[in-house]
Amino acid sequence: MAKFDAHLKCSFCGKSQDQVRKLIAGPGVYICDECIDLCNEILDEELVDGQGNSRHSHEPSRKAMPAARKSSKPAPTLASIPRPQDIKSFLDQQVVGQDAAKKVMSVAVYNHYKRLAWQGDGQGETEETATRLHKSNILLIGPTGCGKTLLAQTLAEMLDVPFAVADATTLTEAGYVGEDVENILLRLLQKAEMDVDQAQRGIIYIDEIDKIARKSENPSITRDVSGEGVQQALLKMLEGTVANVPPQGGRKHPYQDCIQIDTSQILFICGGAFVGLEDVVQKRMGRNAIGFMPSDGRGRSRANRDLQAAQVLRHLEPDDLVRYGLIPEFIGRMPVSAVLEPLDESALQSILTEPRDALVKQFRTLLSMDNVQLQFADDAIEAIAQEAHRRKTGARALRGIVEELMLDLMYDLPSQTSVKEFTVTRAMVEEHTGGKVLPLPGAEQQKTA
């Protein structure tokens, strides 16, 4: 036993039991009196620093924290802000359809950045500029894969501002396991490279906002830490407050250095599918159908059902969102709302070919690097769109289908140097037999997209 004790050493500094005055044992670890004294010194110095009596803190803990920095970019000016029609034209290049939602977002974003430029001019002494302009956050309602996130991303790209995406399902009320709402601001700050001024002019998109709806219309009598509790925690951030953001993320704790961010200039865009919301609207209107939505869905195509659901949501009122599960205070902080329509087969075909980064163009570019000219027959484009519409996941289904179709082609074509041109046909889409690189009879006569 004496021989075993001689090999005991501190788990932190590595000194043996003979080199220190005291060695304290824990469950599988040991710590010496010198390491304990060092820990006490670190805690005492940080405590004094937090009270403002000293600016000396332990150097290692300072080095681990990213520091906020001042912005080198000027605030936007009225002349530099694109007009609503210019914003919509830019959105048209990336997002197919959704004209009503594009118009709503273009005007809302234009007014938001006009407000920032107006405040940045330093002319607040006159009677005209003394009027305070409040921001208008945006609520996007639409089925999955209809372009909600892409709209927000395209806006941020055009305006050259930091853009962060957060998932509402990961947020919990303070004091519970999960992410604090302040972590959303940390993501925006990281996108701005820790530039606070730039982050305060950014855009935050909170996805799956419908998933934090409370379970019933009545206020909860028990803790709903990932539903109503998160809505309550988001209220001040959406309205505008100075939030303390921990630079390393995670939970805040006393004496922790935080970065202060003013959220009054941050544009919040919340999006969600809100499945079943059309039923709430119909119930409010007092009947199972409102003239164009028969109660018996037999015999109706899915395209007609989706179109009719979108028509129902045009009659949406704030009370319907309250009945769905959002609290009135939360709805009041999202004054601008836009309903996105589900994508039909025609829109899905356009998504495949028209946008700047369309899937067809991407795969053509990839195969052109192997000196192969790839073509998609018109009926193949139609078949892909039909399959994507059947899968009910919107535009997201397109990439999955095309990836499945092109897998074997992308594997074989680079090795077959004799093949200079290849056309994807409808039969290949329907049977997913694109793996065999065979000459297609009459391929050159096929009308291609």
Swiss-Prot record:
InterPro entries xrefs: AAA+_ATPase, ATP-dep_Clp_protease_ClpX, ATPase_AAA_core, Clp_ATPase_C, Clp_protease_ATP-bd_su_ClpX, ClpX_bact, P-loop_NTPase, Znf_CppX_C4
Recorded superkingdom: Bacteria
Gene3D superfamilies: 1.10.8.60, ClpX chaperone, C4-type zinc finger domain, P-loop containing nucleotide triphosphate hydrolases
Database matches in PROSITE patterns: CLPX_ZB
Start and end residues of each ClpX-type ZB domain: 1-51
Keyword Nucleotide-binding: yes
Pfam families: AAA_2, ClpB_D2-small, zf-C4_ClpX
Residues involved in Zn(2+) binding: C10, C13, C32, C35
Annotated binding of ATP, by residue: P143, T144, G145, C146, G147, K148, T149, L150
Keywords: ATP-binding, Chaperone, Metal-binding, Nucleotide-binding, Zinc
Gene Ontology terms, MF aspect: ATP binding; ATP hydrolysis activity; ATP-dependent protein folding chaperone; protein dimerization activity; unfolded protein binding; zinc ion binding
GO biological process terms held by the UniProt record: cell division; proteolysis involved in protein catabolic process
Region feature Disordered, mapped onto this chain: 50-83
GO CC annotation terms, alphabetical: HslUV protease complex
Function statement: ATP-dependent specificity component of the Clp protease. It directs the protease to specific substrates. Can perform chaperone functions in the absence of ClpP.
Protein family membership: Belongs to the ClpX chaperone family.
Record text on subunit structure and interactions: Component of the ClpX-ClpP complex. Forms a hexameric ring that, in the presence of ATP, binds to fourteen ClpP subunits assembled into a disk-like structure with a central cavity, resembling the structure of eukaryotic proteasomes.
Name of this protein: ATP-dependent Clp protease ATP-binding subunit ClpX
Organism in which the protein naturally occurs: Synechococcus sp. (strain CC9605)
